[in-house]
Amino acid sequence: MKQQTFSDFEYSNRKRKTKREGFLEIMDEIIPWDEWVGIIMPFYPSGKRGRPPKGIELMLRMYLVQVWFNLSDEGTEDAIYDSYAMRKFVGINFLEEDAPDATTLLKFRRLLEQHGLNKLFFDAINRVMVETGHMLKGGTVVDATIINAPPSTKNAEKKRDPEMHQTKKGNEWRFGMKCHVGVDAFSGLVHTIEVTPANVHDICATSKLIREDDEVVYGDSGYLGIEKREEIVSDVHLSDIDYRINRRPSSLQKVSDNSINWDRVIEHAKSSIRCKVEHPFRIIKCLFGYRKVAYKGLAKNENRLYMLFASANLYALASSGQSLAAAW
């Protein structure tokens, strides 16, 4: 049990909690800390030489604060000193130790990036969700969203990030990368992520988002014609899938006022399932504030997205009043 500080006693008498503190308590309860620490442990410095390293769980908690609140390394360090809720979540007691500095957090983040540990966190969470019945098999919803990147050339290199590209969405030009996701059609939880430059069409990454046991795939009208693509036709499993793609509204037949428009009824039924893919995007963009890339290049941002979607899956599960225990 953690030692109580004067701040803990003072804050315990408050009449209400902030939304930030409530969110951190939800995540603290649902994250499988022992499993995540075990994933990091083989790659973490042993401390046999030099200064003893900070605890793995402490650094992981500090990194999660950075990811969830979209903070810089220095901003995360300052936030822990400023915010009681964040300090409590990380587990820092100023009577015993100071918060890890920005450089220590930077080295920890690079450790996660170098060994692709965020993907291991994501896969571990999804494996448990399948085993406990929270994520079912058989159906996937596919979609993609653009994450903006700085388009300016006013920097030391006088050029944009070469791994990002521009694309036109509607009447607006966007510059950045595109995040493609495959979502479980039953639960709305993300099971697969693919990251590409923004100019790659949504339909090009579809084959990588489909699971081996999927029988049905839902998508918006941007995925029309998916069943005719070479990578789909040439694959025995992918060619046998039922692709329920929404048609464009302009292609639907018009009927008289007194008749039932069955085309629209069918499209509405598809949309009622397909809309589940928008919920994870709302969490990472609106709750976690990840509307712009945090780093240069696709690899580092992909690593961050794995943690964001792992956290989004856990938050969605907790928000519905469930836990990682068996659903039945």
Predicted regions and their residues:
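Basic, short loop/linker segments at the boundary and entry of helix-turn-helix/winged-helix-like folds
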Residues: R16-L64
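Structural motif
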Residues: R49-E57, K296-L305
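C-terminal domain-tail junction helix/linker
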Residues: N303-F309, N313-Y315, S319-W328
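Polybasic low-complexity intrinsically disordered regions
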Residues: K2, V65, E74, D78-D82, ...
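Helix-centered, glycine/charged polyanion-binding patches within enzymatic domains
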Residues: T5, E10, E215-V216, S221-A299, ...
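Amphipathic, well-packed alpha-helical segments that form the structural scaffold of globular domains
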Residues: V37-P45, N126, F281, K285
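Charged, often Cys/His-bearing segments associated with DNA-binding zinc-finger transcription factors
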Residues: M1-D34, S319, S323-W328
